[in-house]
């Protein structure tokens, strides 16, 4: 398995010209797609636009430059990241941090409080013992895991914003040996930044996919070969948690919405016939045992969808419903082990079942 610090540029900008130039003076829509391995995962951005190709090229270049820069800030798996430097100062004085890191930590601690710790950005000490998704993943020694959990209290993370313009923001990890790990929220945070960047370039039709964290911006175009291409909602697939992932079990139609799914199938290892997945329960320190196979969150902000997907998977169905009532405009789709599917009111009519083994309850 490869470390998330790998930078491998797998492709240059692919521009699919579906109608060259203009037709009768009308600019036609062009589809642009770019993919790279960065932030430890495959990141894809697809854009539809009538704007000059050079402008779209420039915007996509900015997107992937942003991702490369932010990996140097937010990665828990790079020794040279800003987050690693902060973790190294745990138990000492406050540390001046990058404003993007500070903003992300603010939101992460908000969701930690709201979820009662089911989402916990300070779980790094325990996560490192498991090392799931990397080389040498292993079941930790029980005593070592118990000790690590004593260093996972998110309430020991203290933020202080600069009170004047230009004043530094600081973060203090009050307990020695504690470690932040933002893997359950960072991709959502970066997806939001990408959407802001695309919008600033007057690009209003795009699909951002950061390792399965989706943001569907605006409406897509249908047949881009037509000068009057139809605008359609994006169809986002939800996989069978026990399938190969090659074909979706469900499809949900969305626009201006992030879709993030958490499930036990994403990263795991097996020992002695037992599967250990990567979503750790902060109470037990072990992979979460829950009554759902996967949870998909639909939200206007990908940061929120990312954090809530993890929290809801750990909490299970009933407690998740209680939590989500505090977030108007956020919807959820739950897949249960018996292949029942429950979706909240805001999206249930947008769900199409493609695999007849799954039953959408209404």
Curated annotation (Swiss-Prot):
Signal peptide: 1-22
Record keywords: Cell inner membrane, Cell membrane, FAD, Flavoprotein, Lipoprotein, Magnesium, Membrane, Metal-binding, Palmitate, Signal, Transferase
A Gene Ontology term for the protein's cellular component: plasma membrane
Cofactor stoichiometry and binding remark: Magnesium. Can also use manganese.
Gene3D superfamilies, sorted: ApbE-like domains
Main location: membrane
A Pfam short name: ApbE
Residues binding FAD: 118-120, 181, 187, 278-280
Molecular functions per Gene Ontology: metal ion binding; transferase activity
Lipidated positions per record (N-palmitoyl cysteine): 23
Record-linked PROSITE patterns: PROKAR_LIPOPROTEIN
Reaction catalysis annotation: L-threonyl-[protein] + FAD = FMN-L-threonyl-[protein] + AMP + H(+)
Location within or outside the cell: Cell inner membrane
Cofactor: Mg(2+); Mn(2+)
Disulfide bridges in this chain: none
Residues involved in Mg(2+) binding: 184, 306, 310
Protein EC: 2.7.1.180
Lipidation (S-diacylglycerol cysteine): 23
Family to which this protein belongs: Belongs to the ApbE family.
Function of the molecule: Flavin transferase that catalyzes the transfer of the FMN moiety of FAD and its covalent binding to the hydroxyl group of a threonine residue in a target flavoprotein. Displays FAD pyrophosphatase activity in vitro, hydrolyzing FAD into FMN and AMP.
Binding partners and assembly: Monomer.
Name of the protein described by the UniProt record: FAD:protein FMN transferase
Gene: apbE
